């Protein structure tokens, strides 16, 4: 966390991303099951959809002068603004393996219950220019059930009358 002690120990320009809040994005919650298909497009498993969480970060720049901090934050903002969505190919490990894009919001409207000034006060640090970065990320519940084998035979239909005779 960017506390006074942490700030006193740094000796080079630093961009710090401090995770200050985690909340489920209940608007994205889905019910039911999703089909997992193999390379032949055959359903091999069914799984619960992932749960989505809003991760809120306080992004700050730490240098010797305020002007350098502003320039560094400007560079961070210029890097993040065009990136409204991160595709699965750019996500690490199991997060990328889900095949879902991850939306980013930078310097958006503060909708969480705590203001950034309250966060700074709780950290015991001086108020600094910062960016609020919100990453909405899926959490894989890893609850998959194998699907039954696909039906490969054609259906057989036979008609009988009430007495069981086939002469219909």
What are these regions (language model features)?
Residues 1, 7, 105, 128, ...:
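Basic, low-complexity intrinsically disordered segments
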Residues 1-35, 94-95, 99:
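Small/polar-rich, solvent-exposed N-terminal microdomains that initiate assembly or binding
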Residues 1-4, 31-34, 47, 92-96, ...:
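Hydrophobic/basic alpha-helical segments enriched in Actinobacteria
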Residues 1-3, 41-42, 115-118:
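Short structured motifs
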Residues 9-10, 46-52, 123-127:
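Short glycine/proline-enriched loop/turn "hinge" motifs that connect secondary-structure elements
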Residues 12-16, 52-58, 101, 128-132:
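Broad gene-expression machinery/nucleic-acid interaction feature
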Residues 40-100, 138-168:
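Charged, amphipathic alpha-helical segments and their flanking helix caps
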Residues 71, 81-136:
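Acidic-leaning, charged glycine-interspersed low-complexity segments
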